[in-house]
Amino acid sequence: MDLGLSGKVAVITGASRGLGFATAQALAGEGCTVVMAARGLEALNKAADKLRSRWGRGSKVVPVACDVSTPDGVDHLMETAIVECGGIDVLVNNVGLGRGGSLEQTSDADWREAFDNTLFPAIRCSQLAVPHMRHRGGGVIVVVSSIYGREAGGRMTYNVVKAAEISLTKSLAQQLAKDQIRVVGVAPGSILFEGGSWWKRQQEDPKGIADFVGRELPFGRFGAPEEVGNVIAFLSSSRASWVSGTTVVVDGCQSKAF
């Protein structure tokens, strides 16, 4: 199926690995120019080279090393996207962090860190992308949240900021429909990739994670980043033109919520 994304400009945060890289890969495969944002320049350049080697040296891939938890980092990312690519059609907000423990164990600093690294990047990137999308007659904003934003399951700080992202998705979708800008959420379940949180836990406690898989994952395995990236590519396309304001769960039936 041709998704009609050829020539579109897509900005993806957290793009050097995992879900972000898989999303960049899926969008590049559909002919998008991809602007890949991440903090670490070395890992980011390696990820960009992987895309170029797969889709050809002529592929337009723009790596931008920046910290989107800061206003300056977001400014740098969006300015680079406009200067290098001329506009923005798709924005994929894909960063998140949550530390701390129980209510009494979680400090104000833990809460601030969760909001600064999850919710505020999505807000700030969207604020700067919307005028350019409006100028182009529309666009798509994808907010990557989590099933733990719909039901408690991870760290408390992570649950809260991911729930906030789901609410943000609905609010933005209602505001921006008049501008032909769709806003869609994606809530992945437990996804395994090298260097990711589940991979680290698997290295530390293989039996415990095997028990978790058998107990909590109906298909008997973790999801793969590509299984989420492909959904994001579809939602970013005109094939999903009537999908806005909802959060699509991609979890292999892991979550218990309707």
Show which residues each predicted segment covers.
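Conserved glycine-rich cofactor-binding loop
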Residues: 9, 16-18
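Short, small/polar-rich loop/turn modules that mediate ligand/substrate recognition or access, typified
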Residues: 92, 177, 182, 243-245
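Substrate-binding pocket helix/loop in short-chain dehydrogenase/reductase
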Residues: 102-103, 110-115, 213
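Alpha-helical segment proximal to the catalytic Tyr-Lys
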Residues: 131, 174-178, 241
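Residue(s) in the substrate-gating loop at a strand-loop-helix junction
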Residues: 146
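Short C-terminal tail/terminal secondary-structure segment
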Residues: 233, 244-258
